[in-house]
Amino acid sequence: MSLNLPNPSILGILLVVSTHSGPQLVFQYPPDLSNDSKKSSNLKRTNKTSTLQRKDSDSDELDIDDDDYIADNENDEEFVNADNDEEKEWDSRKMNYYLGTKSDLLSFLDEQEKFRQTSQERNKIYGHKQSDSHIDPDEIKSLHRNSKSGSSDKQIESPKLEASNSNNLKKTISSISDSQKSSTSKASTSGIPPVSPITSSTILGFEADYLCEMLCPPKQMCNSRFEIMIDDLVFLGLPIHSYDNGSWKSKHSHRPKSGKSSKGRSKNAADNASIDEGIDYETTSKSQSKNSMSMFHLVFIMNPPIIECNYRIDEMFHYVISRLSLVLRYEQSKHEYVWNQIRMIYNLKEEFRNQATMANLTKYLTDKSSLCKLISECFTQISRSNIANLSINNKLRSFQIPIKTEFHSLPDSTVPYLPGSHLSSTVNMLANTGLISVGETIRYDVNNLNSGGLDDFDDIDDNKSDSNADDIIYYALLLLDDPETIIRDIKAQQQSTLANFIRMIKPTESLLKLANKLKQQASDNGFSLDAGQIKSFAFHLIYWRRARVILPISTRSVYIVSPMAPITLKFHHDIFIFKKTFPALPSLPHFLKLLSNSSKPRQLATVIPSKDHRDAYLNALSWLIRYGYVTQLHTFIWLKISRKIKMKVEEDLENEGANNKRKKPSATADPNISNKLNAGTDNTSKTESNPEDIQRKMSQLRMINRNNNGNPTSYEQEIDNIEKKLLSPSIGLNLVLEDEGDTIIIDPGRASSLERRWINKVISEECNLSPELTVKFYELLKYMNGKNSLELLLLKENVSRQELRTLLFAIEDHIISVRHW
């Protein structure tokens, strides 16, 4: 597996509520959660492992699951092999599979294990004689009560269990099941709501009542992320609890803005802090409802791969669970939607109580209850990695886990990805908007696993996201399907504004150009859209996976065969489709050969035979970009400062410093010259380090030494050595080598004072730009950072290609250009 491949890992969804009657399971989907084959296989593996552990261990604490024990009094080898013989009787899908809660079952299995050991010892003495008496259910129940009330260290006296074969055990289970059924019938006659078949079955091997208690946390743990793992299953949700005043949203709560979250999933703000939307709820008498529901919890059951566990869990919580739960909380606060639906579900269960199967009950509930319907549709669509369009209180809401079909850099050769993925650096524009999910370039990124690869709601830099999102107006939209098919799939009206907008989208026109065209045609056809509406429609189409953001397709742009082209997977099939779609054009292999035939990439115009073929070639190019065969080649530039420029600027600074010193009174000589010499070289004092100054200072140092010591021999020799080193020509060479290389200005838009001097020197003396080009240079200077392509620069700054070509030719010796996707 890979993080680039969709893997929701969802097994089911539970709706649990807490009322005055306690925790209750309202609805589960799919209805046959107990029949999950993956869980059954995990339980079987756990059976064998736990059985072997019981055979070799004398510990009282056994790491076992609900179906670990099979009663048999044969030898150890026969006991280990008994799993296969008793699988049909011990079926986890049946009601009589469990004897009670999990703690009760563990206590019972402990007693059965003790009995098996004593039975084996007794068989050795008495010749393996067995009794035909049955296990008394009352004694088992008393054992359960004793195990609950007593301490774990206290020895519980074994009852008189003289038979442990499978037939007797099955009779015991059936008798207990009958007693449970009779107690249920008594409860229904006493006025307590009857337990429906959907709440009395086991869920993935666990008793429903046990799960309900576990999935209804205390109030202090609600309104924040809930996550618990049992065996290989993860129960994930966002429990919503009402406040003391009866409202479902704190009146004074707000979302504090914070910086980036710290490392680790445990420090994620969405996990530990209270999750609240930035919606101002009105605390009215209606919000302080008198219903008996104090909490509801929509729980997603997941079984992700171990190495992807953190990432898949965070992904599901971020994109689906948190957003869906908050929408339900909003509807509950405003209209009591959840509570009204739950009461309806209880009434529907009462009507359907005497019907045949659980599957029929689930279908009946999904047909009648909108809450059950949205839960079932959410599971169906999310498990298929589709978009879940849910109707919540007659309002359409969309939820999805974005598919990773956009890459800003080439993945490793061992990293799987979806065929037809798009490779372009322009995807970074929408990386922080949540509309797309950028693909991973390595198989398992440790940082992404720790943080989930996801930004929290509060972790997005708003300013950065807004500026990037605004740039979409300069891009074009490439529809990923036929316009009429998209209109039909999104269920838009044929003559609606959105439908007309979809029909007008062309990959050769930017959205800004489309907006200007609509303004001009508004007086004629009465159809107008401003830039804000166009951006909103574009974001919706991208989120619905109906469109892709690209730079407008042009014959003057350069296109190459994408390194991620699905040559080995879909090539033969796409050859037939391409020939059928564009019969007048060369075949798909020949078309790709035209784009990559030359050693140097060239413009698309050189490939088109004539103007009559222009539209056909542009349509074919759009088709190739849509299916990931072709990507555009972008040009990025940096501003380079040569060594010559830096030396000139340094000379100017030295001259300015010398002039400033002449204007000031001369400072007194420092007698501690030796301290300055030993302190190291100061680059700021290089202007004073000429040979005459060095000799003068050395003579002063000799005079000071003679006056102090009278024995100048050793000190004079040391001073002579220092003088030779300072006057040596190698010092000058070493000083030049420090600044011998060229410098690339990473961010010229935020250049320092020294870097601005370098840039001014390049423009004024080296390039001798005209006043017009100088003005244009400073307008485009911020884009010379290697992050913004020149193709986008032409669209944003309204610069003609001729002006840009003239400017780049004038500063050719002082720029570094790179071309990539």
Curated annotation (Swiss-Prot):
GO terms for cellular component: GATOR1 complex. Residues 116-142 have a biased composition (Basic and acidic residues). It comes from the Eukaryota. InterPro entries: HTH_NPRL3, Npr3. Residues 1-21 form the signal peptide. Pfam families: HTH_NPRL3, NPR3. Residues 669-688 have a biased composition (Polar residues). Residues 170-192 have a biased composition (Low complexity). The keyword Cell cycle does not apply. GO terms for biological process: cellular response to amino acid starvation; meiotic cell cycle; negative regulation of TORC1 signaling; positive regulation of autophagy; TORC1 signaling. Mediates inactivation of the TORC1 complex in response to amino acid starvation. Required for meiotic nuclear division. Belongs to the NPR3 family. This is Nitrogen permease regulator 3. It comes from Debaryomyces hansenii (strain ATCC 36239 / CBS 767 / BCRC 21394 / JCM 1990 / NBRC 0083 / IGC 2968) (Yeast). The gene is NPR3.
